[in-house]
């Protein structure tokens, strides 16, 4: 019998403010049927009858946009419905501006053991410029309050190559991030997505971004500075102190299956990738009628599974095991990708050691470009 996934992602689509760069499934929380949504989420959890979970991740949107009572309802009911006896990691995303002392107390009495904060930048002017609702002072207050409550597995997200951002500002951000004394950071370069404020500005010629050389210098500096301070660069955008890797995210990069629950959530079960309906009312109606809200379902061919194995695995510092690939897919790696690998090695983008393939530093900066080379038309 096929082993069932032991990870689940739960989506809370509500936000108190819509950030200018964000294209995730989200809505402004005011006047939304939040209680109905949380109740529907529990029905969806029951529908899937999940096995014992190893990792659980609540993302958004902004889970901390929920009121204290709503957050308590969410966490208490999840713990009642799910088997968390084998749980290793339970992450919740939060914003520094709305994670109050009362909400931290709710987290503290739950099984949540990891908090990921959407910091993005420490620069108050830049925070306003990108549509964030918190300020620098709130970042420090929230981290201090979490530590005081006993949370030590704390991660922050930072974005670089923001509109008008200089190298000096990146240097300052990295210094301030290191001062927080936390064990995990995710650093992303700004990517312009469709249907965002920033993309609309770009199309009108009103968005001034650092050029690719400056962005590359920023990436090099971040890498060098964090590694110098005891962080391991274990995935293209992620840095960890020993033992604090995001186990849930490693599950994605290992191309493992997982449940995706909530409006707009994606999941991967029984060889099928699926996406739930995004609009809240459509999600609620679907849960009432069917128990689930899957809209888009796609069974992956072996070719697609191999492509995903490569471009997800190469995101990690450890890279892709040729042996594991051949065991999983029952074909010769050399026959399938030998020429692609030789070309990428010659271009200085890939390296091989003990039948493991990993990206070079240059390859990491050009990550998506390298990944695309593994898409081969049969």
What are these regions (language model features)?
Residues 3-5, 26-48, 52-331:
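C-terminal scaffold of the Radical SAM
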Residues 10:
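Conserved N-terminal Rossmann-fold NAD(P)-binding element of oxidoreductases
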Residues 13-24:
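Local cysteine-cluster metal-coordination motifs and their immediate loop/turn environment
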Residues 15, 257, 354-355:
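Beta-strand-connecting loop/turn residues
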Residues 345-355:
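A short, conserved structural fragment
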Residues 356-360:
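Minor-groove-contacting beta-hairpin "wing" of winged helix-turn-helix DNA-binding domains
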Residues 364-378:
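Short, amphipathic alpha-helical interaction segments positioned at domain boundaries
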């Amino acid at each position: 019998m096929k082993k069932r996934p032991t990870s689940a992602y739960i989506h809370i689509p509500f936000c108190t403010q819509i950030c200018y760069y964000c294209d995730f499934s989200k809505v402004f929380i005011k006047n939304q049927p939040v209680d109905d949504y949380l109740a529907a989420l529990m029905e969806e959890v029951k529908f899937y009858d999940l096995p014992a979970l190893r990792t659980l991740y609540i993302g958004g949107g902004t889970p901390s946009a929920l009121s204290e009572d709503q957050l308590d309802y969410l966490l208490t009911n999840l713990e009642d419905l799910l088997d968390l006896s084998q749980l290793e990691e339970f992450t919740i995303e939060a914003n520094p501006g709305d994670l109050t002392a009362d909400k931290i107390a709710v987290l503290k009495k739950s099984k949540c053991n990891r908090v990921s904060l959407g910091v993005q930048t420490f620069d108050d002017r830049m925070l306003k410029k990108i549509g964030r609702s918190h300020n620098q002072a709130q970042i420090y207050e929230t981290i201090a309050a979490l530590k005081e409550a006993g949370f030590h597995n704390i991660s922050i997200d930072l974005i670089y190559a923001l509109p008008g951002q200089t190298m000096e500002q990146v240097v300052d951000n990295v210094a301030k991030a290191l001062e927080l004394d936390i064990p995990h950071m995710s650093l992303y370069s700004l990517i312009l997505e469709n249907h965002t404020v920033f993309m609309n500005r770009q199309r009108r010629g009103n968005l001034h971004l650092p050029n690719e050389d400056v962005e590359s210098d920023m990436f090099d500096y971040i890498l060098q500075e964090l590694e110098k301070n005891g962080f391991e660069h274990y995935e293209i955008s992620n840095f960890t102190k020993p033992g604090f890797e995001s186990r849930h995210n490693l599950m994605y990069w290992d191309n493992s299956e997982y449940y995706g629950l909530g409006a707009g959530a994606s999941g991967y079960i029984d060889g099928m990738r699926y996406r739930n309906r995004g609009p809240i009312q459509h999600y609620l109606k679907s849960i009432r009628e069917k128990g689930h809200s899957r809209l888009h379902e796609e069974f992956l061919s072996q070719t697609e599974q191999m492509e995903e194995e490569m471009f997800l695995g190469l995101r990690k510092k450890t890279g892709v095991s040729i042996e594991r690939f051949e065991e999983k897919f029952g074909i010769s790696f050399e026959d399938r990708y030998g020429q692609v690998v030789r070309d990428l090695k010659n271009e200085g983008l890939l390296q091989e050691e003990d039948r493991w393939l990993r990206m070079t530093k240059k390859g990491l900066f050009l990550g998506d470009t390298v990944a695309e080379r593994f898409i081969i038309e049969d």
